[in-house]
Amino acid sequence: MEIGQYQPNLDGDGLRIGIVQSRFNEPVCNGLADACIEELERLGVTGEDVLLVTVPGALEIPLALQKLAESGQFDALIALGAVIRGETYHFELVSNESGSGISRIALDFGIPVANAVLTTENDEQAVARMTEKGRDAARTAVEMANLAVALEQLDGDEDDEGEGEDDEEERA
């Protein structure tokens, strides 16, 4: 049996990307952002098509993502942050709630959101992961933005089946 398969598309030309970056654990978050923006540029996304917004911490990321999603100006969003375990339960709370909120934005608004909020046991782990995770977030955002467009076109193709010429004139 032969099946259709979508090939990943990492061409960022013309894509508009919104980035929300936490300022808490700032050196790590800046490293994430630098790697992410560098990779977006390598993939063909221009600086004028990227908006970087900073927020105090990981718990504030979902609201900023929501506002960007509501604007309708972006093809994909990226969340950047670092939650590093301390000696209290706060780590679990921040990790779980920020992750849940980020996922909810993607589903509620139908927009790809690449989640690069690191959750690590210590500073060393965060520093070791920040560059590759920043790059990965850029690739994920571009790939998913292109996939979303391709899948939306599938939906449009199904709507066209069986329509007459009158329907085509209405869309023109």
From Swiss-Prot:
Pfam families: DMRL_synthase. Keywords: Riboflavin biosynthesis, Transferase. Residues 154-172 have a biased composition (Acidic residues). 5-amino-6-(D-ribitylamino)uracil binds at F24, A58, L59, E60, A82, V83, I84, N115. (2S)-2-hydroxy-3-oxobutyl phosphate binds at E87, T88, R129. The keyword Cell division does not apply. Residues 150-172 are annotated as: Disordered. Pathway: Cofactor biosynthesis; riboflavin biosynthesis; riboflavin from 2-hydroxy-3-oxobutyl phosphate and 5-amino-6-(D-ribitylamino)uracil: step 1/2. It catalyses: (2S)-2-hydroxy-3-oxobutyl phosphate + 5-amino-6-(D-ribitylamino)uracil = 6,7-dimethyl-8-(1-D-ribityl)lumazine + phosphate + 2 H2O + H(+). GO terms for molecular function: 6,7-dimethyl-8-ribityllumazine synthase activity. InterPro entries: LS, LS/RS, LS/RS_sf. SUPFAM superfamilies: Lumazine synthase. The active site is at H90 (proton donor). GO terms for cellular component: cytosol; riboflavin synthase complex. GO terms for biological process: riboflavin biosynthetic process. It is an enzyme of class 2 (transferase). Its EC number is 2.5.1.78. Belongs to the DMRL synthase family. Catalyzes the formation of 6,7-dimethyl-8-ribityllumazine by condensation of 5-amino-6-(D-ribitylamino)uracil with 3,4-dihydroxy-2-butanone 4-phosphate. This is the penultimate step in the biosynthesis of riboflavin. This is 6,7-dimethyl-8-ribityllumazine synthase.
